[in-house]
C-alpha cells in the first residue's frame, strides 16, 4: 500500500515551521526564500501590533474581563506549541482533585470537528458547551471533543472537561451544571476575556523563545516581556543544566515561583487493547515511530533513551487527523522492516482509527511530568488555591 500524501495545507505548514525554526541569517537564503521571509517579517509586525492593541483594550477596560467568582488557574505559554501544556494541566488537575476540589478543565478543543463558521456565527449564543467528561464518564470522542480534551478526560476520572471557543460560557456551564469550584484554563495565557486567579506559564528549556520573533516569522505568540504576568513558571524538558534558561526568565520576571520539570515516560501501552508493557520492553527492540505533534524529536529521543533502536520515523503536521490508509501504511512498513513495534504518542493514539488485527505491535508512550526542583513552590500554589476563600484573584 502506498503512503497517503499530506494535503497542501499540511505541506505548507510543515515548510513554514521548518523555515522559522532555522536560525541562519536571512541574507544567506535564496532570493525567493528571502522574499518569503520578508513577507513573514511584515506579517509579524502586523501580528505584534494586533497583540499590543488587544492588550491595550483589556488593560484600559475597553474590553471586559469576566470574573466567575471561583478560582481560575490559567496554564499557557508565550510560544506556539511544543512546551508540554497537557501533562502540566494533568498534574494540576490531579493534585487539586486529590485535595477535594471539584475541578473542570476548560479548553477550546483545537482542531476538533466543528460546524462551518457561518453556522457557528448564528448559533454560538444558544449552543451549549461540549462536555467531554462530566467527571464520571467520558462522553465524547477525540474527533468531536479534541485530542487534548479527550486525553485529559480519559486520564482524569473525577475531573470534568468542557470545550467551547467561549471559555467564559464554558466556565459558567461547569459551575452551574456540573457544580465545579475550581477551573483550569487550558492554553489560557492569551485568553484574557476570562479573569485569571493564577497565571502558570511554561517555557521549553530546549527552545525557550525560538528565534525571538513573533508569529509568523518566529514562534512567539506575544512578547517575551509578558512573562512578567506569570505567578509560577514551569521550565519544561529539563535535561542537564538549565541555569541559562532560568537566568533568561528572571530578566522578565523577578518574583514568580520557578519549577523545573521533565517529561518522563511512565508507561507503554497497546493503542487499542490498552495492554501495558514495562518500559524495559523497549530495551534492544527495533522500532518505528509515527507522530503528528509539534515537537516529534523529543518523543523519538525518549525512545532512544529507553534503549530502543529507532529505524524509521514518520511525521505528520501537529494534530493531523489520521485515516486508515496512513496507519496501515505505517504498520506494514514497520513489519516489512522487521521492526518489533510501531510506537506513537498518547496524543496521536487517540486519533487512530480502530484495527482488529495488525501485522505488528502498535504501542503508545505515556508521558507524565516529573518535578526536578521547585516541588515546594508547586505545593504552595496548590495550597493557595485550595485554602483561599472562593474569590476571583
Describe the residue ranges of each PLM region:
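A transmembrane-helix-recognition feature enriched in membrane-embedded lipid enzymes
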Residues: 8-71, 385, 389
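Residue-level signal for inorganic ion chemistry
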Residues: 46, 86, 152, 186, ...
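Glycine-rich phosphate-binding P-loop
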Residues: 73-92
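N-terminal phosphate/diphosphate-binding loop that engages ATP/GTP or pyrophosphate donors
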Residues: 91-159
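Phosphate-binding/switch loop-helix module in NTP-utilizing enzymes
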Residues: 151-195
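Conserved catalytic-core segment of NTP-binding enzymes
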Residues: 173-176, 188-281, 288, 300-301, ...
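Redox- and metal-dependent alpha/beta enzyme cores, enriched for Fe-S-associated oxidoreductases
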Residues: 266-269, 273-275, 280-324, 379, ...
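Generic C-terminus detector
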Residues: 335, 339-341, 347-393
Amino acid at each position: 500500500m502506498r503512503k497517503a500524501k499530506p494535503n497542501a495545507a499540511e505541506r505548507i505548514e510543515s515548510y513554514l515551521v521548518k523555515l522559522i525554526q532555522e536560525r541562519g541569517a536571512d541574507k544567506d537564503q535564496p532570493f525567493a526564500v528571502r522574499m518569503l521571509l520578508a513577507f513573514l517579517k511584515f506579517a509579524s509586525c502586523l501580528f505584534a501590533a494586533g497583540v499590543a492593541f488587544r492588550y491595550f483594550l483589556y488593560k484600559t477596560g475597553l474590553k471586559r474581563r469576566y470574573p466567575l467568582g471561583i478560582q481560575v488557574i490559567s496554564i499557557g505559554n508565550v510560544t506556539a506549541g511544543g512546551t508540554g501544556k497537557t501533562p502540566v494541566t494533568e498534574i494540576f488537575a490531579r493534585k487539586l482533585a486529590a485535595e477535594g476540589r471539584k475541578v473542570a478543565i476548560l479548553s477550546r478543543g483545537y482542531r476538533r470537528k466543528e460546524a462551518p463558521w457561518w453556522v457557528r456565527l448564528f448559533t454560538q449564543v444558544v449552543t451549549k458547551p461540549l462536555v467531554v467528561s462530566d467527571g464520571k464518564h467520558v462522553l465524547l470522542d477525540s474527533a468531536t471533543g479534541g485530542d487534548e480534551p479527550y486525553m485529559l478526560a480519559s486520564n482524569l476520572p473525577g475531573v470534568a472537561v468542557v470545550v467551547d471557543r467561549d471559555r467564559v460560557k464554558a466556565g459558567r456551564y461547569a459551575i452551574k451544571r456540573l457544580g465545579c469550584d475550581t477551573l483550569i484554563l487550558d492554553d489560557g495565557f492569551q485568553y484574557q476575556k476570562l479573569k485569571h486567579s493564577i497565571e502558570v506559564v511554561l517555557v521549553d528549556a530546549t527552545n525557550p523563545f525560538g528565534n525571538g520573533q513573533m508569529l509568523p516569522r518566529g514562534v512567539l505568540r506575544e512578547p517575551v516581556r509578558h512573562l512578567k504576568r506569570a505567578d509560577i513558571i514551569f521550565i519544561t524538558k529539563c535535561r542537564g543544566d538549565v541555569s541559562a534558561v532560568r537566568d533568561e526568565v528572571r530578566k522578565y520576571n523577578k518574583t514568580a515561583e520557578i519549577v523545573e520539570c521533565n517529561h518522563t515516560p511512565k508507561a507503554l501501552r497497546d493503542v487499542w487493547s490498552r495492554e501495558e508493557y514495562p518500559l524495559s520492553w523497549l530495551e534492544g527492540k527495533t522500532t518505528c515511530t509515527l507522530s503528528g505533534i509539534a515537537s516529534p524529536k523529543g518523543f523519538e529521543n525518549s525512545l532512544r533513551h529507553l534503549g530502543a533502536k529507532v529505524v524509521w520515523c514518520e511525521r505528520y503536521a501537529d494534530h493531523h487527523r489520521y485515516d486508515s490508509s496512513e496507519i496501515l501504511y505505517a504498520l506494514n512498513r514497520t513489519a516489512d522492516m522487521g521492526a518489533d513495534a510501531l510506537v506513537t504518542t498518547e496524543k496521536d493514539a487517540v486519533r487512530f482509527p480502530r484495527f482488529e488485527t495488525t501485522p505488528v505491535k502498535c504501542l503508545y508512550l505515556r508521558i507524565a511530568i516529573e518535578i526536578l526542583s521547585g516541588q515546594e513552590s508547586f505545593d504552595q500554589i496548590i495550597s493557595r488555591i485550595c485554602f483561599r476563600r472562593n474569590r476571583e484573584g
